[in-house]
From Swiss-Prot:
GO molecular function annotations of the record: translation elongation factor activity
Pathway: Protein biosynthesis; polypeptide chain elongation
Keyword DNA-binding: no
Name of the protein in question: Elongation factor P
InterPro entries: Elong-fact-P_C, NA-bd_OB-fold, Rib_uL2_dom2, Transl_elong_fac_P/YeiP, Transl_elong_KOW-like, Transl_elong_P/YeiP_cen, Transl_elongation_fac_P, Translation_prot_SH3-like_sf
Function according to Swiss-Prot or TrEMBL: Involved in peptide bond synthesis. Stimulates efficient translation and peptide-bond synthesis on native or reconstituted 70S ribosomes in vitro. Probably functions indirectly by altering the affinity of the ribosome for aminoacyl-tRNA, thus increasing their reactivity as acceptors for peptidyl transferase.
Subcellular location(s) per record: Cytoplasm
UniProt keyword list: Cytoplasm, Elongation factor, Protein biosynthesis
Native organism: Borrelia garinii subsp. bavariensis (strain ATCC BAA-2496 / DSM 23469 / PBi) (Borreliella bavariensis)
Gene3D superfamilies reported for this sequence: 2.30.30.30, Nucleic acid-binding proteins
Family of this protein: Belongs to the elongation factor P family.
One Pfam family named in its UniProt record: Elong-fact-P_C
Organism superkingdom: Bacteria
Length: 192
């Protein structure tokens, strides 16, 4: 961990604020006549995803930290624990769902035997990185009838992980679809 001056902090930097890792989302530098330089930061807490704002004076410092990724295969979920295997060391990594809201949001997108990037800080997993769009198989569709509609008609579909999303009427059981992992919305059908 290194100490950096407030003027050296860039967008995308990782900082330790009050003992918790944050990423810099926005950085605004302003220099007033007599008051000196001010750096305004918009930061996202990497553990709970809350966004905060911090203002630093030109002479202030912050602690820069190193965040790294570990490639791991998702094995299974056992009650409130997600179990992964580190693909480099073959060690099992267990993540308690009660410890972090980050993990709870990712569960519907995790598929057994798939590879994910675990975001690490100080040898502790703080997040699971998902692809922007993830492929799923449709296992159940809600009955829907085509009719005269002004807008796009949508129906609920259940995916192989239990995730339920709205999709167009032409989606059927057995189809493969892409779902946006951030919005949890149907993106497109995968043509086979």
């Amino acid at each position: 961990m290194a100490v950096v001056k407030s003027s050296e902090i860039e967008k995308g930097s990782f900082l330790l604020i009050k003992g918790t890792p944050h990423i810099v989302l926005e950085r605004e530098f302003s220099k007033t006549g007599r008051g000196g330089a001010i750096v305004r930061l918009k930061l996202k807490n990497l553990k709970n995803k809350f966004v905060i704002r911090e203002t630093l004076k030109g002479a202030d410092t912050a602690e820069a930290i190193e965040i790294y990724e570990v490639s791991a295969q998702y094995l299974y979920k056992d009650k409130d624990v997600l179990v992964f295997m580190d693909l480099e060391t073959y060690d099992q990594v267990s993540l308690d769902l009660k410890e972090s809201a980050n993990f709870q949001d990712k569960v519907p997108f995790l598929q057994e035997s798939e590879t994910y990037a675990l975001i690490m800080f100080d040898n502790v997993v703080i997040d699971i990185k998902l692809a922007p769009k993830i492929a799923f198989e449709v296992v159940e569709v809600e009955a829907a009838v085509k009719g005269d509609t002004v807008t796009n008609a949508m129906k609920n579909i259940t995916l192989n992980t239990g995730l339920v999303v709205k999709a167009p009427l032409f989606i059927n059981v057995g189809d493969k679809v892409l779902v946006n992992s951030e919005t949890k919305e149907y993106a497109e059908r995968i043509k086979s």
